Structures are given as C-alpha cells and as structure tokens.
Design a protein with these regions (language model features):
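Short glycine-rich, low-complexity segments
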Residues: 1-57
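HINT superfamily self-processing domains
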Residues: 2, 15, 68, 73-79, ...
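Small/flexible residues
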Residues: 6, 77-80, 88
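Acidic/proline-rich low-complexity IDRs
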Residues: 11, 70, 91-93
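A sequence-level detector of short linear motifs
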Residues: 31, 59-60, 87, 102
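Short beta-strand-initiation
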Residues: 44-46, 72, 88
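Short, conserved turn/kink motifs that form compact alpha/beta structural patches or helix kinks used as
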Residues: 48-83
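Structured surface patches comprising rigid loops and adjacent beta-strands/short helices at the edges
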Residues: 66, 87-101
Length: 104
C-alpha cells in the first residue's frame, strides 16, 4: 500500500519555518531552524504549499514564511513567483512539500 505521509497541522512549523545560511567556519550551506549570528547569506527556505482559501478554493505555489501568529494559528507567506503576500490559516493547509496535513 503506497500512502503519502500525513502529519497533524500542529507540526506545520517543522516544514514551513526553516532557514538556510552559509556557515562561516566551513563555507558549507546549512539548513535548520535557528541560524548562528555569525552566519552569512541568511534566507528563508522556500517550500511548496497547497491550502484551502476562506472562499473554498484550493491555492498552491512555492512560498516562504514571513511571520507566524501562534495564537490565531495563522502565518504570512510570500509566493516566490508572484511576490504576493497572503495570510494562511494553519487548519486550512492541505499539503506542504508532499506531506498531507490533517486537522483533528
């Protein structure tokens, strides 16, 4: 049986809030959640998202996470191709980088 992996929407942070930077000691490109202060070329890691809008349409694209509001379970994302900034509700996220998200 070939199923795609599923996660709870509460684990969304592990997929959306990654950083990418160049390590000054080794010169290698690193990926993680907290970058050191001495890191160079620090930028957010892009990810593919598919989510449901408030009007019921499915929207998708490659974007980066700009900010998170944990009390409202919302995050601001900027689409890479268009530069459009949108607010996405965590419970309406269907898929991130091939991993399906479910609500309880």
């Amino acid at each position: 049986m070939n199923q795609r992996p599923t996660q709870s929407y509460t684990a969304l942070r592990r997929y959306c809030e990654k950083w990418q930077w160049t390590d000054p000691r080794t010169g290698l490109r690193q990926t993680g959640y907290v970058h050191p202060q001495t890191a160079r070329d620090v930028e957010r890691m892009p990810f593919f998202i598919k989510f449901l809008t408030r009007t019921g349409h499915v929207d998708q694209g490659t974007c980066v996470c700009l900010s998170v509001d944990p009390l409202r379970h919302q995050r601001r994302v900027r689409f890479v191709e268009s530069g459009e900034v949108r607010v996405v509700n965590d419970v309406l996220v269907l898929e991130v980088d091939g991993t399906r998200f479910i609500t309880h």
